[in-house]
Amino acid sequence: MRIGLQIIRFDWPGSPQNLGPTLANIATTADQAGFASLWVMDHLFQMGDEFGPADAPMLEGYSTITYLAARTSQIHVGVLVTGNVYRHPGLLIKTVSTLDVLSGGRAYLGIGAGWYEREARGLGLPFPPLDERFERLEETLQIAKHMWRGDRSPYVGRYYCLTEPINCPQPLRRPSPPILIGGEGEQRTLRLVAQYSDACNLYLGATSAEFAEGLPRIQHKLTVLQQHCQTLGRVYEEIERTVLATVHLAPGHMQVDEIVQLCRSLAAVGIEHVIFNMPNVHEIAALEVFGEEIIPIVASYD
């Protein structure tokens, strides 16, 4: 089992003046601690509720993850997950290719249909109806495959037309950076995972009660994914199974043994890669504890 880290907020003490140094410290610590992956969100407004108000500090995802890639050497990097309709697919694939080249082959393409209408409308970005967002997502996945195999013939879809999809340089990671699709809709999202993706990302929860409730749901979603793979002739084991969860590793909150047990339970239902976000990530100590007491133990889980 591998452990990843997602950074979800930027309202730390001293923000925004110290955001650059704090983010660099988080990234280098995670890299040295043995985290397998490092992610930021693709949001332009904060998400509300426990995450903070819409006008809380929020950094653009690809600028931020490129900054963090430049300060690390081993950890894989990505955006969890890209809102597909926020960028034209040709530009998105060029962006991820550039990230992969500059990071030495460490990029993921994390992607989803997009859901946060307020930020899209607020900044004047397109936000079509749900069915169209999924149709556009599928075309983007096709374009990614098209460009990353070096096919320069035109791509003509219902929504996107690329007359000369040159992509040079190609990513260092061959045949391409891994494509990770976020979401767990059984009819559309998981079918797209089976057809196009190298990884799925499911959401577990943020509390012990949500973890207990989420485990059987995760197991069910993976069963549905297996069924889609069988229908499409895809080898299920080729797909990296990841989950996203929130933990607060600190006195009075979750402890090391609880997180280790959570990882063990996730491994038992077929999860290979757990991506955690932590409200106290800027304090650094929790990352060091992960590196010393959690990552070495869960590495043996399969």
Which residues make up each language-model segment?
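N-terminal beta1-alpha1-beta2 module of alpha/beta enzyme domains
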Residues: 1-71, 177, 212, 277, ...
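Hydrophobic faces of well-ordered beta-strands that scaffold small-molecule active sites
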Residues: 3-7, 38-40, 76-79, 107-111, ...
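Active-site mouth loops of central-metabolism enzymes
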Residues: 7-21, 80-90, 131, 174-185, ...
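Short, acidic/polar
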Residues: 17-30, 92-95, 183-195, 253-266
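Acidic (Asp/Glu)-rich catalytic clusters
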Residues: 31-32, 65-74, 96, 100-106, ...
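Short glycine/proline- and charge-enriched loop/turn segments
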Residues: 45-51, 119-128, 173-175
